[in-house]
Amino acid sequence: MATTTSAANTNLAKSLGADIVIDYKKEDFETILKDYDVVLNSQDTKTLEKSLRILKPNGKAISISGPPDPDFGKEIKANWFLKVVVKMLSAGIRKKAKQLGVTFSFLFMRAQGQQLTQITKLIESGVIKPVIDKVFPFDQTNDALAYVETGRAKGKVVIKIKQQ
């Protein structure tokens, strides 16, 4: 598994299972990585386009930050106009993926009871180890949001609703 991060977060990335850590401030992952089966993109479209190039033939790029694809339009039962808009939003990246012999899909993250139950079991058993950066009391919600907006959180930012 490979990831990009700043040099300051290299040890954290390795502790979470990364075999290869690339300092995005100094290196271009596109020139270092190749022949991956799957890419999970949480960055911008420019990074997503680079990610397509590190996949092996028939590889898959999954983006949680967009652009939404036609399947997403169907999944949310969008009206015909919105389906057309969604299709247009991802037309460029889908075309580039096809030219490279890989596929692209958009994954819309949402809370679903059954999935959350499964995730809870994985956390409780230690399979998933969430990284919590900071915990804010409820009355400091604005501070928590401001911290998230800095883009410098190293894990989850939690807002504690009530005292235990």
Language model region names:
Residues 1-164:
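Terminal helix/beta-alpha structural elements that buttress the NAD(P)+-binding lobe
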